[in-house]
UniProtKB/Swiss-Prot annotation:
Keywords: Amino-acid biosynthesis, Cytoplasm, Histidine biosynthesis, Isomerase. The gene is hisA. Its EC number is 5.3.1.16. PANTHER family: 1-(5-PHOSPHORIBOSYL)-5-[(5-PHOSPHORIBOSYLAMINO)METHYLIDENEAMINO] IMIDAZOLE-4-CARBOXAMIDE ISOMERASE. Gene3D superfamilies: Aldolase class I. The keyword Amino-acid biosynthesis applies. The active site is at D8, D130. It comes from Cellvibrio japonicus (strain Ueda107) (Pseudomonas fluorescens subsp. cellulosa). One of its GO terms (biological process) is L-histidine biosynthetic process. This is 1-(5-phosphoribosyl)-5-[(5-phosphoribosylamino)methylideneamino] imidazole-4-carboxamide isomerase. NCBIfam families: 1-(5-phosphoribosyl)-5-[(5-phosphoribosylamino)methylideneamino]imidazole-4-carboxamide isomerase (TIGR00007), PRK13585.1 (NF010112).
Amino acid sequence: MLIIPAIDLKDGQCVRLRQGLMDDSTVFSDDPVAMARQWVDQGCRRLHLVDLNGAFEGKPVNGGVVTAIAKAYPGLPIQIGGGIRSAATIEYYLQAGVQSVIIGTKAVKEPQFVTDMCKAFPGHIIVGLDAKDGWVATDGWAEVSNVQATELAKRFEQDGVSSIVYTDIARDGMMQGVNVQATVTMAQASSIPVIASGGITNMDDIRALKAEAHKGICGAITGRAIYEGTLNMAEAQAYCDAN
């Protein structure tokens, strides 16, 4: 199980939102490339980037910063989410050196788009499912749909989606602990590996997720916890490697 540091980009800065609210953000760094260096130095093997402006505008806004990080660390697998709604955007990021793109809102509203993109860019497509009480939320979490997250996962099973980033939005950025049961339910709904996101606070969460990792959980994204120091990224990864 990989520990995946998150760098959330807003107006070129590295921030964290609480429950996805753009006006409730904390700036952690105005140099995202240097921020990435900190996690690389601690041994991170994958980086999770989010273009927050892009998620709300539906097109890349912080693409220049993403490209700069990818160029600075060419051997590091990077996944990017936020505002990915077209083949042109996916191509832009992959050519910039990003390994995987995360399709969120469009995956819910237009599942055929995921099917098509998996064919066009095999092995590079991740689906981001953000859920509240099991129901999928879209458009930067502004809308909650009538689609169940587990049903959508089953739909993408045949498409060749490389993984699902599953976020429990009630817990994201709140430091209240990860929703292990909801993550396990998602992992067992399909054969697609699941990356847990939202609410990871300390080693207790890592231990709880790792204990269930054999059910299909391949990674854990952490943001606020590693920035505020309640979780040590290197220690968490060492624990996952040893157990």
